[in-house]
Amino acid sequence: MKRLQIYIDEDVDRALAVEARRRRTSKAALIREYVAEHLRQPGPDPVDAFVGSFVGEADLSASVDDVVYGKHE
């Protein structure tokens, strides 16, 4: 385990102390838990922001040659 020194606001420190006492653990253990939990949660998929952003035929991949080279008869 790597040692890390951080600065936190006093109100956060007080809240950590209260929660640590309630759980009968250390503030450091709580911080490790909170950080690990946050890092495990996947963030929003940036591709989701594009869903519904484009107008056009629903599936151009089925007719890519027609779209790129013009319709073939």
Curated annotation (Swiss-Prot):
Signal peptide: none annotated. It comes from the Bacteria. InterPro entries: CopG. One of its GO terms (molecular function) is toxin sequestering activity. Pfam families: RHH_1. GO terms for biological process: detoxification; regulation of DNA-templated transcription. Keywords: DNA-binding, Toxin-antitoxin system. Antitoxin component of a type II toxin-antitoxin (TA) system. Upon expression in E.coli neutralizes the toxic effect of cognate toxin VapC20. This is Antitoxin VapB20. It comes from Mycobacterium tuberculosis (strain ATCC 25618 / H37Rv). The gene is vapB20.
